[in-house]
Structure formats: C-alpha cells, structure tokens
C-alpha cells in the first residue's frame, strides 16, 4: 500500500464524498479526515522540492475549494460572508499545521476568489465559482 497517497488509507472512502459543502461542521470534518495523509506527505514533498498537487486535488474532491464562495454561489461563505471568518481561520490553521505550502496555496485560493468577487464582472465571478466547484 502506498502510504503517501491521498486520501489517507484510513479515510479511503473520502474520494466518494460529494463536493458540495453541506455545513461548516461537515467541511471541517472532511478536512480533518484529509490531514493525516497531507501531513504524512508534507515532509517528503519538502525534501524533494515537490508541489502538493495531490493534496490540492484532495481539497477539491472534499469540497474545500468551494467553501470560500458565498452561499449564493454554492459555498459556505468562508472569508466572504459574515460568520465565515472563524471557520476560515480554523481551516487555514489546520491545513498550515499539516503542510505550510498547502496552507499558503489554500490561502491564495481564498484571496483570489475574494478579489474576483470584489473587482470582477458578473461573468468572471461565475467563471471563478465554476472553477472552484470543479475542483
């Protein structure tokens, strides 16, 4: 068994999860299920100079890339709506503790969605949301 593959072997059923976030609590549970595998691979990736490609894909499959979207676009409003700051901080802290590069990539994703929402055309906002929903 490849112990470096995601999702973590103890959470192999995670790949069948729907991408649409049902609630913040469920999303944080999905994140917590991913983190053992993320942490396991982080040291190896740091040593190799590799990128956390599988980890980003796992975040997408778990619906975490959608969570920062406003509810009107299918997200949970993490960082984009009132009440979304604390869950976002919790997620960033957990991801960053397991893998700082992955945490920074997720932070950049959140910031990019916020910038497009603030300054983009309606078409650009919908395109960014569709990309997030696609993982």
Q: Which ranges hold each PLM region?
A:
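Glycine-rich flavin
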Residues: 53-61, 66-135
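Alpha-helical interface subdomain recognition
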Residues: 2-90
